[in-house]
Structure formats: C-alpha cells, structure tokens
C-alpha cells in the first residue's frame, strides 16, 4: 500500500479531518490532496524531489504531505522551532528545492554561511488544497513506483550532534499503521493530533493510523492546556497519543467530565514516570498505555495492549517485529538480564540520507540498534532501563539514571527530574540531579537524600542536586539532558554553578 492510498480508506461522506472550525469529509480530503498534487506538479515537483514542509499542525500540512507522496517525491517535515541556520542545514543536506511554508522564510544569510547555493522555491501552504485554475492535472503515477519507494525524510532532533535524516518508505509507514491495529481504533473513533506532525510519533499514530481505519483526525496546531481540554470535551475525542508532560498537565487541569469520552491514552516520545501514570489513572479511570519507538522504525516498535497494560513497561513488540536483547559482543543475554534492544521488521527505515557509514552502524547485521538498554519479563513485556549513552559508570558500577529519576519523582514537591553523569576525579563519573518543583513547593535536600538512601545503593545516589525553574525539553517533550549539561558546564566554568 502507498501512503496516499490512506486518503480513500474512509467512507466518502464521513468526516476525515477537523481543524478548529473546519471539517473535511474523506471525499473533500481526497479532492484537496489532488489539488495540492496538481499545484506541486505545476510548480515543477517531480518524482524523487525533496519537498520541505515548514508548518505547524494543520489540515494543509496533511494535504501537502499526501500531495508530495502521490507524486513520488519525498516529504521533509521541518521542526518549526528551528533557527534559520538549522533549517538551512536540512535544506542543504536533503537537497530541498521546494519549501512549503505559511510565511516566506529569509534564509539568504543562513544559506550563505553553509555555502549552500541551492535555489529553493517557497510555496504557500495555506492555499495548497485549493483548486488552481489554468493548470493541467498531474499525471497518474500509481504504476510508476511501488511501496518500497522512499516517502519521507525524518530528521532526528540533533540532541546527540548533527541531525541525521531517516529515510522511510511507503511500506515502512503503511506497515506500521497495520502493526498498530491492536489499539482498536474504529471508524467511529476520534483521534486527537496535538503532537507536532513533523515528528514521526505524532504523524504515524495520530494521522496515518486513524486514516488507515477510516476514523476522524482532530487537529490542533499546538498544545495549550485550555484549548486541548476544550477540544477533547467538545469534539468527543476518544484516542490520545501524547507525551508524559501532557499527561501530567491533563491530570492537574482537566476534570473527569472533560475526559469522559476518552477510551485510549498512549504515551510515547520519552519514558513515562510511574507517578504520572498512576495519578492519571486514579483521576480519570483510564490506564495509560506506554509505547516505544524511534523515527528509524516509523516509529512504533512496542505497545501496551489496551486493558493489558503493565505499569513501567513499554509493552510487548507489535506484530511483525523481531527483537533481541544483546551484550557488547552482539550475543543474546540470558532471559531477564539487561542489554541493548535491537529490532527488525518491515517498518525499519531504508537508511540515513547520504550517510552510508551511519546507516551501516545503525543497521549492522540487518538489525536496528536502538541504543536503549532493555530487559524482558516472563510474559514478553519489555522494559527500557535507560539509554546506553546516558548510563553512568562510577567506580566500575553501572548506574541507570532512569532508576534514580523514578524515585526522585516520588518525593513530594518534585515536578521534573533528570539525573546526568558528570566528571568525578575519584570515581570517573558521578550523578548530578537537576530538578524543578511544583508551584509553591519547597524541599529539603537532606530529606531527599535520606529518601534515596533508603531505596538505592549508596553508589547510585547523585553527588550533586541542582534546582532549576524548569527543565528544558525538546519539541517532543523529552527532557533535554544535553542542554542541561551544557548550561551546567558553562556555569561551572564561570564559577556560578550552585
């Protein structure tokens, strides 16, 4: 199946998209995609071209994506929070010749800094779904490429260095929507898309999957608590795919009445603290199903089945996924022990754009090496212990920050927590705990240390504790540990770190 075939999965007169006060039936949706395809073809877009999308969530983002895909071109969604220099890097790296935007971007200086002489034609995304008179329809291309043809380039956030573009095929994406079938979405359900569409989690789970089953996608351009809660209530939203920070805010600000139509809540993007999960379930009577995925896997790899979720687990692998847990020699570890989680399936990326060495490293042996440390229980439910790169080695002992963070979250008054490895002359590395507090809360570090000492081995206790007004996050809700560490090291160099 090709990605743009999803636009015809629903009944023609059923509502496919809701974007604030605008509603589009599946028939109107298909017509808008056709209009966009014709506009793009008239502008010069051809098979294999890379077309950037720089936009907040909107119906037009969806029209643009499917219009690009239907021409055999590659969509390149770009994080709208990036600086001009970061945007220019992606344009240069992907070889983007067309950029769909709400407002024209002035990238002249940024492109010059990167010595990029590409001529980029900027197209107004706001009118992309409208029929344009005086242009010829784009030719039918259905038989000229198959589902192994590349569809999209998803750029990683760059938290570990220069962003890499994961290339996903039509098959990668449509196969992943099939893999999600056990989430039970039906045509009568209404799925909220509030996570950014440029991110694979928001796109596949909140757009492609509901379209695959002929359901309704309810679009919000960004998350604000008041509007999100009102939309859930007024539109009768049934399915939520969100990140832990949104789960936490809904618990604090929404009422049970606001959330009465919600049947399914899936958390992804980053690890879900147990306290957030239990507080949410106690208030709304709906269990959060935690899942796991990566941009490189389209993204879903595991998911807790509704009604069978295990707290703290990322669930079993979805159908069609093969997985292993391996040691440093790539040998399987004994059942129940920890090791790197590696996976294989039809949803795994084709590779990184123009990065053959990075592709070989990530897909060595035919398996996607996730960089995550995991274990499995006797029922086949998987648990992410931590990131390999985040693991702290102190006096030869492995410390997994997530284990410490889970306990810090349980201490009264703590709103956010991140444990990060810092240099220690004696031990090699030690943990530093950065945290923020709930409004009006105060805590005693001495009491926090006592609490941790009662529950952890002494070598796991962070050496330092630093309170911040809030912890910086990436666009997908992950705590930006690299940014925290960078700021800490800069302040320390200036003698200002507290």
Predicted regions and their residues:
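Structural core segment of the AMP-binding/adenylate-forming
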Residues: 42-43, 70-132, 439-441
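Conserved pre-ATP/AMP-binding loop-to-beta segment of ANL
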Residues: 136-155, 162, 184-190
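Conserved AMP-binding A3 loop
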Residues: 25-27, 151-175
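Conserved AMP-binding/adenylation subdomain of ANL enzymes
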Residues: 174-190, 200-239, 252-254
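Gly/Ser/Thr-rich phosphate-binding loop
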Residues: 237-242, 251-310, 322
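Conserved AMP-binding/adenylate-forming core of the ANL superfamily
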Residues: 15-45, 49-58, 62-66, 83-88, ...
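AMP-binding/adenylate-forming catalytic core of the ANL superfamily
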Residues: 82, 99, 240, 345, ...
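Conserved ATP/PPi-binding loop(s) of AMP-dependent carboxylate-activating enzymes
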Residues: 316-320, 331-362, 397-399
